[in-house]
Every structure is written in C-alpha cells, then in structure tokens.
C-alpha cells in the first residue's frame, strides 16, 4: 500500500502503485481453463501513428469499463491489444523523416504501448502482436493461397482510381471532389491487373446474417444492407448494330424496372466499356471525351451531383420488343464496375436519364401512370419537368404506351416480361447485388506481400506453403515514388515453384483491411502454428466490439466476410465474429492547417497554435507559434491523425492523472454521442476525485467503523443506506445493460453529495458511511481503477485485485421506505402532500388526505364521491 498524506490525492503515486501491483500479479492475463462464463471484449486495434489521441482513450476506456465490470460480475474476461501496423502513413512518414517505415512503425508502437499502459487498461499484454510481423501475416498469405486454389481469389484487369502522387489505387470513398483524400492529387482512372476476393459469393449470407446480429446497432445493419444492395430484376439482352447494320456482340442490361422497358429511348454505357473503347478508335472526339471522363467522380454522391456528360458512339441497340433501333451513348454516370457497365435508359421514369435526355435532346416517353393520382400535379406528366412520382414504384402504377402490356401493374408487367424473355432466350430473372468483389491489391511497399509468383510459362502460381512467409524486406531505401521492392531485383527475381524456370514475385501488397479482418480471432491463440487453434472456439464470437461507426461498411463488412472464410476452412465454428457492437461517438476538437504545394492541406496540431477566441469561446484567429504567421481555421472536427488535431493523452495524464482523464471521457457524453474535448470539464472531474479521496480519508481518520446493524438504524441512517443501494442498482444497470457510463458517474456523484451532508458520527452512522464509501469505491472501479485500488486499502480491506471482488448487489430490503410522501389531488389537480407510514392502511391514507389543510379548503362544500390511490405516489379525491 502506498503511503499518501491524508486528504492529499497524488494521482501519479496512486497510479504507479496500482500498476506495479497489476504487473507483478499478472492480473489481467487469462486462459481458457476457467469455470467462469467467458466474456471477450475488445476495441478496434489502433494504427501506430505515433501518439494516442483522445478518441483512442474514449474507445479503449469504454471497453475497459465493460471488461472490468464483467470481471467483477464473475466472468473470465479477455481484453487484448495489438497494432494495425501496415499502411500508407508509414510510407509518408518515411519520406518526411528519411527513415525506413519499419523503424518508424516499431518506434511508434513502443511509445503508444507506454501510453496505453499509463492509462491503466486491464489488457492481457501477453497476446500483443503487430500485423506487420511475418509471424502474423504468414497466416493470411497461407489463407490467400488456399483461396486461390478454391477459386475464391482471382486476378483480373480492373478500372481503378489511381492517385498519381501516392502511386496507388484508391477506394471510391477515398476520392473526394475528384482528388485523392490524402495527397489532394487529381485522381485518374486506370485499368491495371488486380487481385480480388469473391465476397460476392457470400453476399446473400452476409445479408441474411444481419438478421441474427441483435446486438448490433440498427444504423450499422442498415448501412450494410444498403451496401450489399440486393435487388431483384431482369437481365435483358439488346442486340447491337454498327453503322452498316452489321451485328456486334449484344449488350446485357440489368433492371429492377422492366415495367418501363417500352420507355427505353437510348442505351447508356460506361466510358470503359469495350464498345466505347472500340468506337473511340475511329472517333477522335469520342476518344478525347473518354480521356476526360477518366477524371470524373466515382462515388455515388458525386455521380448524383456532377454535370451529366456523354456522346453517341455511332452504334444502335435493338429494342427487344418493338425492334426499334435506339442509339448507344457513353454517359459519365454509368460505371463499368457496377452491373454490366450498360443500362437501358428510360428518361421518362429515371431522373438521371431524364436530365441526360433533356441536355442532349433525346426522346422522353411516358410509359407509366398513377392509377389513383392524389392531386392535379400527379395527373400531369411533363417531359421538361421532373416529378418524383415518375419513378415511385411504391405507388399503384399502370402501364401505358406499352403495346400489349398496357393496363398491367408493376407485378403483372414483371411476370409477363420475365416469361416472354425466358421463353425466347432474350433474358432471365436475376438477383443482383450492389456489392462488388473485394480488390485486395495495393501498389504500395509497406504491406503484406501477395504470395504469388509470375512465370512466363506457368502463369500466376501461388507460393508453396513450405516457402511462406514471403517476407517483406524492411531495410530499404524509400524515396516515395512507387514501391522500392519493384526495383529490388534480389527480392523480386525468383524461380517458378512449378517448372523451376525464372520467374518474378508479385510486387503488390495486400489492402491493409486484410490484416484487420481476422485479428480478433488471432488474439484467442496468438502463438498458434496455424492461423488459430481450438482456443478460438472457446472465445469466439467476441462478446463486445467497440469502435467508430465510420467503419460500418468497409472494415465491418470485410471482417464478417473473412470470418466466414475461416469458418469454411474449419478454423472457427461460429458464423459471425462478434455478437454485440458498440459504436462510440467521435471526440471532436479544433483543426488548423496551411495550404500544401500539392493542392492539399498540411494540418497543424492545436498544441502548436496560438488561438484567439471571442467572449463566447469561439475561435476567431490563430497563428503558428513557431513563426507567428496565420494559419487557416478548419473548424471542429473529429480528432484524427489525418487532421492532426489530437490531444496527447500523455500530457493530460501527466497533468491530471489517468483516472481523471478516464472519468472525463466517460462522463462528458453518452458513448454513442460525440464528445467535445473541454479541459474545463477535466478540471471538474479532478475536483471530484480529490473530494472522494478526502471523504474516505476523513472517515477513516475518525476511527474504525463498527458492524452495521440494520435493525438499529434511524430514519436518517436508513435514508442514506437506501440512497446507497438505489445507486448500486442504477449503476449496475448502467454498466451492464445500458452502457450509460455518464449516468452511472452522475449517480455516484449524487451519493457522494448526499454523504457529504450526512453528519452522523454515531456508531451506526459511521457503519452506514463505511458501507456507502465501500460501494462508491467498487462502483467507480471500472472507470477509476487506480484510485479505487488505493481507497479500498484505506478503507481497511487490504491490497487485492478489485476485479476479483464481487460487484455490489443492491439490498432490496434497504430500498423499502418506512414512510412515503404522497401527492394529494382534488379532481386531478395537485392540492398538497401527506406523509404516511409505508404500511399504512387505506382508511388511514384516505383520512389523512381529506384532512390535509389545503385539500380540506378545496373540499369544503363538496361531496366526496370516490378516492383513487396509486400506491406510493398519489391520492386523487373525486368530489362534486
């Protein structure tokens, strides 16, 4: 036990003592040999950027609070930690600092590990790993070669978003206003060979599995459903003719609105479609347009808002029913990566087609009307003015201008057309998914090498398992242009495992989402020879996963998919990796930047900026401390490494102590809401910690408490004890069911305030106070474990791991009141209150209510007709 002056809270001494005890006893190291129910709780693993920010602290404190609470409620709890260590930021730092990415990464891991340990998290550090080590990534290389052999990993050319500065492929979500999200460079479209995983083979299972994830937020499940994007429709064939009438390869289009087929007036294809590329060979104007469209937006938001552009390519498509020839156009809102890269254009009933047709003077035909228009506006159809009902499939519709299909509704038209096309071999029913196969190739150096060898004779050959891992060379010269392993002949050149001839290694590396898609399972058996061993089935699925909702689509989708791959490889038994998901809100803070030479922004940490504020605390100006020159104000944004606006938790821990920082991060907002960093709020939490420390020491300094004798308690003593057990019940519910940590803290603060007003130095008064203080220490232990560890000893309970002490249980008998205060109403209006014994008879309550002085005045001259008693709350006298 540390020696601390009474009433003086020294967080650093307290925290050092507690952490030394936990380390010496290996307090949080767990195994599978326990009769306790298991609870696997973790947060999304951090990228070792160099320093934690308060968003990390909030994330990891949430999982730590739950983990410690579960330990105290009798669970065998696993809370691990590791490092998502590959990725582009390490390369950028290597360029900036003239150091190898590996050296930079490992140094950051050491620093951030120390930061995490200073915060006192109950982590099993024996399971720690970094995803950039061969011991880790060998397993995903082995899995990839097995997926290749099963046909679930394949290589094909794909049109990608190419960042010419970072020299890599970007996901659609990483392209912002046509520029790379990190470099700010104008993004190009290129067709290059890429490796893919067939996530689309699992699309329906991924969709169906969402119905089983009752512990996931509905918002996340909705985003995943929309991303998977299941739609039922028809795939229809359009024959194609050139300018001479000669037949070319037909186009196949997928549509969910076959009822509008007779409204097709042209067919749109993507700029990368083979027909467009073929036509451009003899059409310089078209070729120039296709080159321009390479720089167009690719995200759905950009496709919706960007100006519609296109050109007829000189070919026609034959309408499969009318036989009419309609022109084929290139359109910038059609993407080769979605569907077949061709769509039937129905400008009368699709808004993008409508805008395109009006711009280029193409025909617009109405083929659907509302059966029951609600107003005059819905009775009119105007080819120059778009109305939402034109495409509203949820309304009762009827086909017009559609030959023999006139009068049919959507369902009738769908069935009639499906039967016709299937009979004639012109189409078929099809379920389509918006989800695309996962492109896992990245043209970067700092990533897991893709285990493939290219042989002129044998083609793409998976590296044999006995030659794995393919180790990424770490001591490289890194100039920042492309990947150094592409120009490293001793690494790149090898022999073919099949024929023994000269061959070359794949120089692309895996998308870093690969590493984060299976790490949760690896924690269960970090030293297993295979990817995981039997221990995985003890711990998996994880019981609680904590992370930001920004990961709802990419990480959490790949995470679920990869777990199913592992299940099908008989590595795990469970269908899903996690049963409960908590998506914490952002921690936000001010941002500042200067314009970069490349058109992007150089973000500056707020600690390096002198800020001017108005009387309301709003930022009005800022200068860089180093040179005194102005910087731009970027507004309040999520704390992140990309915006460089993180607060270093180490400085906060140094100033206030870890428990105070943890307490503020849990108190300032509910977990799901954004938390605005406010140091004044941290000061408030520090004052509470000092007050709690003083309360305990004052009580103990007055002598030992006697045993509690419930039967001997006074009314005031019973009231304090009742408050204690009400608090226990509320905090238990807030921790265990609601994850409402801010209200749990508020409840303990209320108990502390009540105890401060309880001035009873009698033996039983001190016994009640002892019980309340012990309860407060245990209730706060999941959030302020260091102080709780020390105060438990001060209260005379000895040095022990509080996680092995049972969480307090509310004594139901203590919640029973001896006396109750009831509201007295006359005809539903409040007229007074009465105090009655908890076991008072009905007749006594009625008499007291009628005798209440103010109520008696309102009853004067009236006859009491009925008295309604709501037990413990209200007496309502009905009189007239």
Curated annotation (Swiss-Prot):
Task: Give the binding site residues for ATP.
Answer: 641
| Catalytic reaction equation(s) | tRNA(Leu) + L-leucine + ATP = L-leucyl-tRNA(Leu) + AMP + diphosphate
Q: What is its EC number?
A: 6.1.1.4
Where is this protein chiefly located? Answer: cytoplasm
What InterPro entries does its record include? aa-tRNA-synth_I_CS (IPR001412), aa-tRNA-synth_Ia (IPR002300), Leu-tRNA-ligase (IPR002302), Leu_tRNA-synth_edit (IPR025709), M/V/L/I-tRNA-synth_anticd-bd (IPR013155), Methionyl/Leucyl_tRNA_Synth (IPR015413), Rossmann-like_a/b/a_fold (IPR014729), tRNAsynth_Ia_anticodon-bd (IPR009080)
> What's a Gene Ontology MF term here?
aminoacyl-tRNA deacylase activity
Q: Which UniProt keywords apply?
A: Aminoacyl-tRNA synthetase, ATP-binding, Cytoplasm, Ligase, Nucleotide-binding, Protein biosynthesis
Q: What is this protein called?
A: Leucine--tRNA ligase
């Amino acid at each position: 036990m540390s020696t601390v002056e009474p009433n003086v809270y020294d967080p650093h001494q307290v925290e050092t003592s507690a952490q030394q005890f936990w380390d010496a006893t290996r307090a949080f190291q767990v195994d599978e040999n326990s009769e306790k129910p298991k609870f696997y709780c973790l947060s999304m693993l951090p990228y070792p950027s160099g320093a934690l920010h308060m968003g990390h602290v909030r994330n990891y404190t949430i999982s730590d609070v739950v983990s410690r609470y579960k330990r105290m409620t009798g669970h065998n709890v696993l809370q691990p930690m590791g490092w998502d260590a590959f990725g582009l930021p390490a390369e950028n730092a290597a360029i900036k600092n003239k150091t190898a990415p590996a050296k930079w990464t490992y140094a950051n891991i050491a620093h951030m590990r120390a930061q995490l340990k200073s915060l006192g998290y109950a982590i099993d550090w024996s399971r720690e790993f970094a995803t950039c080590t061969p011991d880790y990534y060998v397993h995903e290389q082995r899995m990839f070669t097995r997926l290749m052999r099963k046909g679930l990993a394949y290589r094909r050319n794909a049109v990608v978003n190419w960042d010419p500065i970072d020299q890599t492929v970007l996901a659609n979500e990483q392209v912002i206003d046509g520029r790379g999200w990190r470099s700010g460079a104008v993004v190009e479209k290129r067709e290059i060979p890429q490796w893919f995983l067939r996530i689309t083979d699992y699309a329906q299972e991924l969709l169906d599995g969402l119905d089983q994830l009752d512990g996931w937020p509905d918002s996340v499940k909705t985003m995943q459903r929309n991303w998977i994007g299941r739609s039922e429709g028809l795939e229809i064939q359009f024959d194609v003719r050139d300018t001479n009438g000669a037949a070319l390869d037909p186009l196949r289009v997928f549509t969910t609105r076959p009822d509008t087929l007779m409204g097709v007036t042209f067919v749109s294809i993507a700029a990368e479609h083979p027909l467009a590329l073929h036509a451009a060979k003899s059409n310089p104007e078209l070729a120039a347009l296709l080159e321009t469209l390479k720089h167009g937006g690719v995200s759905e938001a950009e496709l919706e808002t960007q100006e519609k552009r296109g050109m007829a390519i000189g070919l026609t498509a034959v309408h499969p029913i009318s036989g009419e020839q309609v022109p084929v156009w290139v359109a910038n809102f059609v993407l080769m990566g979605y569907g077949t890269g061709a769509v039937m254009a129905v400008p009368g009933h699709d808004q993008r087609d409508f805008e395109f047709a009006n711009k280029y003077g193409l025909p617009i035909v109405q083929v659907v009307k509302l059966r029951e228009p609600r107003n005059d506006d819905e009775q009119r159809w105007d080819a120059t003015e778009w109305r939402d009902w034109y495409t509203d499939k949820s309304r009762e519709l009827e086909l017009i201008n559609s030959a023999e299909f006139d009068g049919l509704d959507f369902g009738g038209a769908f069935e009639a057309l499906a039967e016709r096309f299937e009979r004639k071999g012109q189409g078929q029913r099809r379920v389509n998914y918006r989800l695309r196969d996962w492109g896992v190739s990245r043209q970067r150096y700092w990533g897991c090498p893709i285990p493939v060898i290219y042989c002129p004779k044998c083609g793409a050959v998976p590296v044999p398992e006995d030659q794995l891992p393919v180790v990424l060379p770490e001591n490289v010269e890194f100039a920042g242009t492309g990947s150094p392993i592409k120009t490293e002949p001793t690494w790149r050149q090898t022999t073919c495992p099949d024929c023994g001839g000269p061959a070359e290694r794949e120089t692309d590396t895996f998308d870093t989402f690969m590493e984060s898609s299976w790490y949760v399972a690896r924690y269960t058996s970090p030293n297993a020879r295979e990817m995981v061993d039997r221990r995985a089935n003890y711990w998996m699925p994880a019981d609680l996963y904590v992370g930001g909702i920004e990961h709802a689509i990419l990480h959490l989708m790949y995470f679920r998919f990869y777990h199913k791959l592992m299940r099908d490889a008989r590595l795990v038994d469970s269908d899903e990796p996690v049963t409960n998901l908590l998506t914490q809100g952002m921690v936000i803070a001010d941002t500042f930047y200067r314009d970069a030479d490349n058109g992007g922004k150089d973000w500056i940490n707020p600690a390096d900026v002198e800020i001017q504020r108005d009387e309301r605390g709003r930022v009005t100006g800022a200068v860089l401390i180093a040179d005194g020159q102005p910087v731009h104000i970027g507004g309040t944004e999520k704390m992140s490494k990309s915006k460089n606006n993180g607060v270093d938790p180490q400085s906060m821990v140094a100033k206030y102590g870890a428990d105070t920082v943890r307490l503020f991060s849990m108190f300032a907002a509910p977990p799901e809401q954004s938390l605005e960093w406010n140091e004044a709020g941290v000061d408030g939490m520090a004052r509470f910690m000092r007050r709690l420390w003083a309360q305990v020491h004052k009580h103990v300094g007055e002598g030992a408490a006697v045993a509690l004798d419930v039967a001997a308690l006074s009314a005031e003593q019973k009231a304090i004890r009742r408050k204690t057990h009400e608090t226990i019940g509320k905090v238990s519910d807030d921790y265990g069911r609601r994850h409402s940590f801010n209200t749990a803290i508020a409840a303990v603060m209320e108990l502390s305030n009540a105890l401060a007003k309880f001035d009873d130095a009698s033996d039983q008064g001190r016994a009640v106070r002892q019980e309340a203080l012990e309860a407060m220490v245990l209730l706060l232990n999941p959030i302020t474990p260091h102080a709780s560890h020390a105060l438990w000893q001060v209260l005379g309970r000895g040095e022990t791991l509080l996680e092995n002490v049972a969480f307090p249980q509310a004594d139901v008998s203590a919640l029973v009141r001896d006396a109750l205060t009831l509201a007295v109403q006359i005809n539903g209006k409040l007229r007074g209150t009465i105090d009655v014994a908890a076991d008072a008879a009905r007749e006594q309550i009625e008499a007291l209510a009628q005798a209440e002085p103010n109520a008696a005045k309102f009853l004067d001259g009236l006859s009491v007709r009925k008295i309604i008693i709501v037990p413990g709350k209200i007496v309502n006298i009905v009189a007239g």
